[in-house]
Amino acid sequence: MESRLSRWCDGLLEAGWLVAILAIPIFFNIHSERVFEPDKLALLRSIALVMVAAWLVGLIDRRGWRDVARLRPSDPAAVWHRPLVLPVVALVLVYALATLFSIAPRVSWAGSYQRLQGTYTTLSYIVIFAMMAATIRTPQQVRRVVSTAIVASIPVALYGLLQHFGHDPLPWGGNVQDRVAGNMGNAIFIAAYLIMVVPLTLARIVDAVGAILGDDRLSAADVARAAAYLFILAIQLLTIYWSGSRGPLIGLAVGLFSFTLVLLVSLRGAGGERRGRDTLFGLALLLPAVLALLLSPVVSATVGPAVAFSFFMGVVVLSVVAIFILVTLRRGWRWLWLAWIALTVFMAGWLL
């Protein structure tokens, strides 16, 4: 039986990573010289130190040294058998050796004055990751992590929109209207952050729409939830687009493709025995994309490439929407993953 102190330490650990997920993307300090990265990382390092202290107190209270046998590789429950443990240990060793043999060990450890991205910062990342991997055990905790990440993205995205429309109250030295920088101080950084949150928001949208279509009686709470997540997704995508960063846009495209493919493949085994009907659903999604691909040269020669591109992308968007509708309606699950791959290939073929 755990003591009250151990439960308090577990609560402090969870509060630590939730605060990190919420505060680091939003926080910046206009009263310091460097404003963004060093100030964010100073806060992150402090959170990591508090989490380490809470973990050590909990370890002592539980007498965790009695479980030292779990460090043996021969033990089936050993920590070494968990995913990513060995790669993370290898990464820590590489950073330690690189810092030890660096021509400027102090800079390698603490990071540069402008960025503060040194071994100390990397170890802070790893500490928070390790604490989360070791202590997140319930679906409720996972939901809290996802919800916190989505909530943190809202002020970041909204601030980007303010900058784009010229309503930023802060006088930045660079042009943040053509390429928004938001709370990150860099157009690439804000887009790179938001593309990590977009799949989480999209998953909540799928869940909310599924609840709406799956219930016999329409729930106002489900409708409000779906509308809220759709709004959040819209401002996230707009901020990513107005950042003008090509790399994150490519990463977003690859991430959305992978997210959807994993989702559809995971549903393949739950499609039931309606193979003929599921095959028809999959083919029905491919036909519009094939026709759009074949008709695009004709449309391009008639009204121009811009209209042809809009025509093809419109058909692709409608096909993607149809896929998600079929997912929520529990139709065609067996072959939707193949339709998604083929649709992506057709789109890539048109672009190339």
Where are these regions (language model features)?
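Membrane-helix boundary/helix-loop-helix interface segments in multi-pass membrane proteins
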Residues: 69-81, 85, 101-113
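Alpha-helical transmembrane segments of multi-pass inner-membrane proteins
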Residues: 1-30, 45-59, 82, 87-105, ...
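Flexible loop linkers connecting adjacent transmembrane helices
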Residues: 61-80, 213, 217
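Membrane-interface anchor segments at the N-terminal boundary of transmembrane helices
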Residues: 34-48
